[in-house]
Amino acid sequence: MATGKIVQIIGAVIDVEFPQDAVPKVYDALKVESGLTLEVQQQLGGGLVRCIALGTSDGLKRGLKVENTGNPIQVPVGTKTLGRIMNVLGEPIDEKGPIGEEARWDIHRAAPSYEEQSNSTELLETGIKVIDLICPFAKGGKVGLFGGAGVGKTVNMMELIRNIAIEHSGYSVFAGVGERTREGNDFYHEMTDSNVLDKVSLVYGQMNEPPGNRLRVALTGLTMAEKFRDEGRDVLFFVDNIYRYTLAGTEVSALLGRMPSAVGYQPTLAEEMGVLQERITSTKTGSITSVQAVYVPADDLTDPSPATTFAHLDSTVVLSRNIASLGIYPAVDPLDSTSRQLDPLVVGEEHYNVARGVQGTLQRYKELKDIIAILGMDELSEDDKLVVARARKIERFLSQPFFVAEVFTGSPGKYVSLKDTIRGFKGILEGEFDHIPEQAFYMAGSIDEVVERASKM
């Protein structure tokens, strides 16, 4: 293939000059003689191309030779990637030797056509009460975990991977986009301890890496997930964190000379998000169910980045700092979280009525809190006292010990089936457990455990 040379280096953006009759295409991967990979972003005319470095540009100098590979970045796909940790280029970073893949796919691929897509209303049971009841996941759907810093997005995601791998024995792909290296390390050890590592492919582009790596690592993970889907499997695709994907795009956009738009984001924000999200879909062969953690800057859900993500999701799980401050984990806000699946035609009348009953009771309690704060509980009517008592039990019963958090909580994790979840909340709403003290409901699994606990109090 054609050879060019570096003519300008501005941080992560590199300009390379090629002969005019052999200019690389946009998204072609170029190899610098030092071993660094570049990706073409713009053709500037006169044989010049502007590229993003997928690695540090330290030590580069003008005049270095650059070779065009003639293809976009290609990464290993298939079952050989399971249990391995790779970087954005699909190179192993776990010191376990080469991957030995059977095939390599381009990371830039077209989304499935309209005819190939399928829609399913089958529910995916997660074993987490609040999610299964209030914002159920669809098999092949897209889920967003929204939350500010430190409210438990990563822990929730780890629990979902563990539950689904063990209870549904499915394959998962985890893309760590611009998150802390420590979290990636914890995640790896957690998967090893839960014996599910052989069912997960891990792709990391961490916080300390150049923007090119963080921008493309989500596509690397998605390509691996697409291969499993096209083999007829139901695969889970986890992204932590989709906000960092946007942020990497913002960093690169300014260096490429584009005008910034609202709040300094790149003008192509909606398009970049769409290109990624449209590929995460289910076809007639298999399904990709995706769970995406979305960092919410300054807890502001109207920020352009989380707001753009909302449009693509089927379920939104909103993690609330107020609930976390009460010590209730998972800190999912049952009044803010939504799901397209929460429809009597999909989940059935009983599930729908119980979920709405739970939300109604909690909403009423929220309204009464001001009165309680000023006048105290004694001023409430008997009916309202009952609502408050039940709401407090529901709040506590929405908490649950996680398997992946056993180290912190000291209590064994619980997986609660959807049937048991509905039975428990239905009982609370109907007053079946009015005689049980509210502390018995805190950090419990099924309702049977609550009853057993209460008998010992």
UniProtKB/Swiss-Prot annotation:
Keywords: ATP synthesis, ATP-binding, Cell inner membrane, Cell membrane, CF(1), Hydrogen ion transport, Ion transport, Membrane, Nucleotide-binding, Translocase, Transport
Function, in words: Produces ATP from ADP in the presence of a proton gradient across the membrane. The catalytic sites are hosted primarily by the beta subunits.
Organism: Actinobacillus pleuropneumoniae serotype 5b (strain L20)
Gene Ontology cellular component terms for the protein in this record: plasma membrane; proton-transporting ATP synthase complex
Membrane association type: Peripheral membrane protein
Positions annotated to bind ATP: 147-154
NCBIfam families named among the record's database cross-references: atpD (TIGR01039)
The family this protein is said to belong to: Belongs to the ATPase alpha/beta chains family.
Keyword Translocase part of the UniProt annotation: yes
E.C. numbers: 7.1.2.2
First-tier enzyme category under EC: translocase
Subunit and partners: F-type ATPases have 2 components, CF(1) - the catalytic core - and CF(0) - the membrane proton channel. CF(1) has five subunits: alpha(3), beta(3), gamma(1), delta(1), epsilon(1). CF(0) has three main subunits: a(1), b(2) and c(9-12). The alpha and beta chains form an alternating ring which encloses part of the gamma chain. CF(1) is attached to CF(0) by a central stalk formed by the gamma and epsilon chains, while a peripheral stalk is formed by the delta and b chains.
Name under which the protein is recorded: ATP synthase subunit beta
Catalyses which reaction(s): ATP + H2O + 4 H(+)(in) = ADP + phosphate + 5 H(+)(out)
A molecular function GO annotation: proton-transporting ATP synthase activity, rotational mechanism
Compartment(s): Cell inner membrane
Lineage: Bacteria, Pseudomonadati, Pseudomonadota, Gammaproteobacteria, Pasteurellales
Keyword Methyltransferase: no
